[in-house]
Amino acid sequence: MIKECRNVPSRLQRSGIRYHAGVIDTVTYRGRKCELSVNLGGNAGPGSRPKGTKGTGYFFIQEENNMTVWEELKARGLIAQVTDEDEIKEMVNNGKATFYIGFDPTADSLHVGHFMALCLMKRLQMAGNRPIALLGGGTGMIGDPSGRTDMRQMLTKETIQHNIDCFKKQMERFIDFSDGKALMVNNAEWLMNLNYVELLREVGAHFSVNRILTAECYKQRMERGLSFLEFNYMIMQSYDFYMLYQKYGCNMQFGGDDQWSNMLGGTELIRRKLGKDAYAMTITLLLNSEGKKMGKTQSGAVWLDPNKTSPFDFYQYWRNVDDADVIKCMKLLTFLPLEEIQEMEKWEGSQLNKAKEILAFQLTELVHGTEEAKKAETGAKALFAGGADTEHMPTTELAAEDFDEEGNIDLISLLVKSALVTTRSEGRRAIEQGGVSVDGEKVMDIKHVLSKDALTGDGVVLKRGKKKFNKVFTK
């Protein structure tokens, strides 16, 4: 069972841990003997205390228990489909798997869906397996049709490279890439120099068009229009697996459950071309109790980049999950021991709010560090209690051009700019229904305006409903 602590607890500091990056020591934690894996990303040398541990040090405690890695993955509900369970189980339990997960750089930040994959990579790395983070510098030029109803926007090479650079920085916060313990590879290395005729002969000959079109993602798109560009995606993803197998001995691919058909294509290509066995496993999709993908808000995706989704907003997203989803999120996304989560399953009523606070803090700490998690928690509690502490609240800064000639801005525009609503009509309804307040005063007038003077300096606090806040100001 795996637990993560950021900033080593004092009880562990007193237990005589050696702060060697990557070294595992035995310590006592909560009365149990545990193994401590210290991953400081090279920030600490042998025998030294870690420097600047806030946000940089990752301390993972592996507690002694009778569960194998595979049993824990199943108990947490992480596994959806597998090709050969016995073989995969044997390899991951004994630290013999070299596996990869692909990340297409479609944006300049990872999001919550990626975070779930990173957590799985970390769990398996701690068990001695070697993860490969495959960055889609090549496949990103095409775009994965899985889960799409339309064609993805074409990205330039420069945009894709920028996104890859952003991904790298974020991944290094979670995965230990030192000394070959994990690899970060860009598939542009082999895809961008492919000879098309050679690809058709060497790879295309092993794929049946009829079989490709039976894949769910392609069946859905056939009804709306599937470009030839996207049609090639399965072949290219399969070729990735084939190349990783040859170059790095990668014998497993993990990914979202919507990737199953593409992953099977890779195992089949390896079998046909090399006569070797390769394996695939899909991760449970992060869905809420209504079957909808989690990780989205009215203003868009929940990002791991604090400049795109603030630590406060990130915390609030998890603090506000539905009662029916909190335990599932605990199991899938946190490193809390299963026995602690199982105790929380018995909680009811107001106790569920405490469980949500634990979930929100754990995930904010994992992504943004202990200090930011504490700030978000303090800010959320102050706002919930009606306090005036707005230091850690998400903010929106207005520019001079946001005001009219008289130096005013209407409330509906403020709601849209602060992402408390997505459209003006939604903002109008929220005001008319009494769901909007300015500095604690409910506003029912849809024509309400605020002056630039009122917004200069500290600004005002906008509130929509009971849980959504934003401080709006101008300089």
Where are the regions that the model predicts?
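NTP-dependent nucleotidyl-transfer catalytic core
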Residues: 57, 62-259, 264-267, 274-279, ...
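Low-complexity, intrinsically disordered Ser/Thr/Pro- and acidic-rich segments
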Residues: 40-48, 53-56
